[in-house]
Amino acid sequence: MSLSYSFNTTIFTENRDLVAALQPQTNCARTALTLIVSDCGKLSSFNEDQQLRVSLAVGLAVCEFKAAQVTYPDACNNIEDWMSTSACTQQLVSSPQWWTTYHGCYNSVKQICHMHEASRECDRALKTHSQIVDMQEKLHTKMDQYWELVETMSDHRDAVLDYWNDTFDFMSETLAHMKETSVSLNAVYRDNFAQAQEHFQMLSENLQEARVQMENLGWAAQDAVVSLSKSTLAEQSLVSERLKNDASSLHKLLVLAHQDTTESFETQLQQSLTILVESSDNVLLNHVQQVSSRLSALMSDLEESQKKNMDMQHQLQQKVRTINDDIEGFTDTVKQGLEASHSLLNLVKSKIQLVNGVVSIFSRPVRSAFQLASFIIMIRAAFIGGIYTSIGLVMGSMLGVLVMQQV
């Protein structure tokens, strides 16, 4: 039995190449935000959480310093906890330029976070899509392994069927040969019984002849007695001697005839029995041994086949359970992809609202130097991340359509 299963695996490579092409370029501000906060929309207590706000502002200020190629304190390079963050801010106070940049990031950190949210959502969507592609590849790999197991079981089943067919053919040939042997043995039995019947017939004829001679001897003896009663003593003696000689000759004849017949019958019977025993014992013993050895081998192969079938069933059950688990994981990943697409749509809506807010800020008059500095810093941040944000929006939209097509 031949089974066939094929799947074009180049689709996985093409999807990975597409994901690599859609990956946005690295951005310092986006990286800093990602390390600290995962979702800007979840910052409901953002104004109250000063530590989080300070940590984000320090990370964004460091990105500003790097972009402008401005030296900054070494304490701001390794921000791991609140103590290191405080040490960084204490050194930023020592320089007006450092402090102005930090303070501007502190005031506009939420807006900057939302500006980079699109590219971050694009990264998450691409990561989810990569997970879906990996899960699909694993699923098809499991399906290939499952199909190979099915083909192996099919080949094993064909081998078992062929073996049983050969065994049944051998049994049929053995029974036919035993039937022929039985017919031959019956013919030997009939021949031997026919010969025995002939020997018994000869013995019966010899006995009949001996009885006739005995009757003749009796009549002769009776005649001799009558003649003796009429003859003299000398004649009686001669007649008696002749009767004794005739009786002795007849006895010898009977003994010889009986011995010849008995020996001939025993010899023939012994030969017949020898032929019967040799033919029946040898033939039947050989066939019984062949059948017994064949049945023993058959039982051994059958036990081995049962063990193999049990092992294959166990492997098949494990494969099915693994495939079910992979399908469940694949379903969860697809759900995550859908959620990422919906989040991307919501993010686009929030970006529109953010643009409207920026427009409204542009329409207001500048009332203080502090507001002007904050406004300039926000414009610089928007200029730095604006290009990547636009690219992120376009790629996010494309990825949303791609994920929906994959689902």
UniProtKB/Swiss-Prot annotation:
Keywords: Endoplasmic reticulum, Glycoprotein, Karyogamy, Membrane, Nucleus, Signal, Transmembrane, Transmembrane helix. Residues 30-382 are lumenal. It comes from the Eukaryota. Residues 1-29 form the signal peptide. One of its GO terms (biological process) is karyogamy involved in conjugation with cellular fusion. Residues 404-407 are cytoplasmic. Required for nuclear membrane fusion during karyogamy. This is Nuclear fusion protein KAR5. The gene is KAR5.
